[in-house]
Amino acid sequence: MATPGMSWQQHYYGGSAAKFAPSPATAQLAGHSMDYSQEMHLKMSKKIAQLTKVIYALNTKNDEHESAIQALKDAHEEEIQQILAETREKILQYKSKVTEELDLRRKIQVLESSLEDHIKMKQQALTEFEAYKHRVEDMQLCAEAQHVQRIVTMSREVEEIRRKFEEKLRSFGQLQVQFEKDKRLALEDLQAAHRREIQELLKSQQDHSASVNKGQEKAEELHRMEVESLNKMLEELRLERKKLIEDYEGKLNKAQSFYERELDTLKRSQLFTAESLQASKEKEADLRKEFQGQEAILRKTIGKLKTELQMVQDEAGSLLDKCQKLQTALAIAENNVQVLQKQLDDAKEGEMALLSKHKEVESELAAARERLQQQASDLVLKASHIGMLQATQMTQEVTIKDLESEKSRVNERLSQLEEERAFLRSKTQSLDEEQKQQILELEKKVNEAKRTQQEYYERELKNLQSRLEEEVTQLNEAHSKTLEELAWKHHMAIEAVHSNAIRDKKKLQMDLEEQHNKDKLNLEEDKNQLQQELENLKEVLEDKLNTANQEIGHLQDMVRKSEQGLGSAEGLIASLQDSQERLQNELDLTKDSLKETKDALLNVEGELEQERQQHEETIAAMKEEEKLKVDKMAHDLEIKWTENLRQECSKLREELRLQHEEDKKSAMSQLLQLKDREKNAARDSWQKKVEDLLNQISLLKQNLEIQLSQSQTSLQQLQAQFTQERQRLTQELEELEEQHQQRHKSLKEAHVLAFQTMEEEKEKEQRALENHLQQKHSAELQSLKDAHRESMEGFRIEMEQELQTLRFELEDEGKAMLASLRSELNHQHAAAIDLLRHNHHQELAAAKMELERSIDISRRQSKEHICRITDLQEELRHREHHISELDKEVQHLHENISALTKELEFKGKEILRIRSESNQQIRLHEQDLNKRLEKELDVMTADHLREKNIMRADFNKTNELLKEINAALQVSLEEMEEKYLMRESKPEDIQMITELKAMLTERDQIIKKLIEDNKFYQLELVNRETNFNKVFNSSPTVGVINPLAKQKKKNDKSPTNRFVSVPNLSALESGGVGNGHPNRLDPIPNSPVHDIEFNSSKPLPQPVPPKGPKTFLSPAQSEASPVASPDPQRQEWFARYFTF
């Protein structure tokens, strides 16, 4: 009974042990997996080492770049400090000039004030002269007797002197008339010249405004033509793009139909499709990164353009403010001219008034002469007239001397003007030479700029051609690799795709060449326009030179005219100074125009750089479109291949199911369910991935369209801004030196910032790529390991579950049918074990195949990683090449900066030279003015001393007269005061005095009545107290509040030692009623009623109300009572008593 069962169990458990024992195949697989992991680890370590080397090299290069950038920053800061120092020096110099001008103006004001004082002094002298006449007439009466004999002898001499004096007066009058005529002629000439100059200036401003408007119209027409040509180009490019898209879609449809026919032959390409999907994902990620980088670059460029626009707008506002300031300065200058003209008119009026006064003086002199002829007998009058004539003779001699000195000064001024004329001629010649040199330098710079631009564009063409060739070679290599990998499956398909790609490339190359040719033509047109603008500027400068020469000739004519008239010397000096300032202004304008041409050249260079950047962006966009199209083709092919492979797999699985349905109904049901689940999950995952890719592609398309629209709008905005900038720059061309320096600084800062941002972006991209590759590699390895482990564990668990189910079923059946079916079960069990072993071996073989496939996938992935690393290295090389190009550009910028610094130094030297010359002229002018002022001051001091002495004498006389007048006035004042004090009183005052006296008497009577009433009440109280003491006399201390206290002696009268709450009224009235009785009892303490002077032994008489006024006071008080008023302190004591 036991033997067959045991044998069956041994056989069963032996089979199970054999089933679950570690087979040699699994051991081999485990060893293979270990070898695989070690090899992968070594490869990854090598790759990491290579990447660390690359990173170290990049870090060293970055350090070198940072050191170079620091050096550039230091140099830039030094240049900024130098420029700031120069600007400070310029500001100080301008401030010194302003202070000098202010000092000159102050001196002019002081001179004008001195002239006014001199006129006032003359008027005072005339008044004093008239007073002196009167005094002399008074003195003549006293000196008649003394000068009788002398006058007879001197009469003849006086007649001779009179004739001479009259002749001198006539000559002096003729000279004055001549001087006035000369002055009038000179003033008229100056006014006519000033009007002509103003008319010429107005004409020149009108011509300049007309030329500026014409230039603006031409620029606007050119800009419109450019905008129209660009719009046409855009429309042509859009049409070509649509055509290319349609052709490409037709080709894609043909290729898709061709590939759908050949999909039946492509069965084992699922792994390759997975790899291609991963590659496409990576490419998409790379494209996204590149696209984000391009977006960031575009945003930065837009921000820079916005900042530049704001800078230009600020500059335009500052220029407008400066224009307004200049207009206000012109208005102020015109007002000053009007004021000066008014002053001239006032001076003329003053001269006319002086002439009228002179005529009046002459008429007075004629009257005096008539008096002398009439009063020949009066010798005293003749003597006085002789003194007058001598004084006038002295004054006229002094005036003649002054006129001679003025003649000498005028001659000196003429010599100075001749010297200034020669200096101006030399200066104009030097300016002509400098302008010619500047024009030659400008021509040289323009030629050099043309050459540099031509070389730069040739280099860019060569670089673009090399880049295109490199890209073509890269694409050819990529296509060759794909052909080698897919040659055993679909040679014909790859050849067709390659041929289509080559055709597309050729078309794109043709399009790019056409675009490049168009860009070349546009650049040549811009060059021609610049040449025309330079020629126009040359013509304008030549016109300005001609006008300057004409003005110099006009000034020479004016100088010749000024030599003829003496009085117009100061006007000519002013006109020469104005002409000098105009010439300086014209020189500044020519310098500004030269700077404007330089700025225009810089703007054109910036525009060329922008067009180059746009060209590069279009090329990059076309490349991205090519990549996207290739990726789409690959993606579509992969999708179709995956669908065909799924169909084939499903067919094979159905055939296998049909073959093994009879044998694997119970054992393989669970395996099939698990496989179905895995299939569904894989299908869902693949479908999700495909949908995600399609969504990403649609989003990328939308983003591209949005970016195209944004770029178009930004282009339009930039064009509009460009037109605005041109208009503003044509209108505001005066003060651009500081703006140029600011732009230079801002460009340097922007360049430094862009360089830093580029370096930071490069570092970030490198780090991101390294992290991404490491993470991706680790994730893929872990996913492969986890998938392998999960598949093995699931397979083991499934087999255990199947064995357990079979064991339980067999045990149940064995218990029921042990005896009858044991032999049959043994045979069936053996057959089932054979079948299970066979299935197990097949499954192991399938697992081995899957492992081999996973190993192949990992190897292919490692190859792809190697390719990726090579691509990254190539990208690094490309970026290094780009960095070297940037270094070259930085060197070029440094060269430009050095050239600009040289130009600035040359201009600074010129400014210093002009400044030194102007300082010399100012010093000479100041010396001349000082000499003149010294001479004038000497004359003024002499006159002042004379007049001072005369005024002192007059002042002393007037002081004596004033003292006499003061004495007489004081005597009269004293008499008037005495009369005022001794005057009679008014009746109204007398009435008021009587009324007041009556009021005082009434008041005194009332006070007396009150005092008497008070005394009456006091006596009544005293009588009451005495009567009380008589009745109660047995107590030792009568009338005291404290009865236990000792009784004081009668003679002791010291009420001051006790405390009194209320003051005693009787005590205060010590000189009151009666003779004072010493035998009286002491009063009650603190009683204000009892008086010590009353007699205590005798009773007082009965109080009787007073019928009339009683005299209880002393005689002194009785005398003072009618006048004195009641005491306020006493009234207070009354109030305290009654309140107590």
UniProtKB/Swiss-Prot annotation:
Stretches assigned to coiled coil: 57-256, 296-800, 868-907
Family assignment from sequence similarity: Belongs to the FAM184 family.
One Gene Ontology CC term in the entry: ciliary basal body
Superkingdom of origin organism: Eukaryota
Localisation: Cytoplasm, P-body; Cytoplasm, Cytoskeleton, Microtubule organizing center, Centrosome, Centriolar satellite
Pfam families, A to Z: FAM184
Keyword Protein transport: no
Region (Disordered): 1063-1128
Native species: Homo sapiens (Human)
Keyword tRNA processing among record annotations: no
Taxonomic lineage from the root: Eukaryota, Metazoa, Chordata, Craniata, Vertebrata
InterPro entries: FAM184A/B_N
Record keywords, A-Z: Coiled coil, Cytoplasm, Cytoskeleton
Principal localisation: cytoplasm
Protein name as annotated: Protein FAM184A
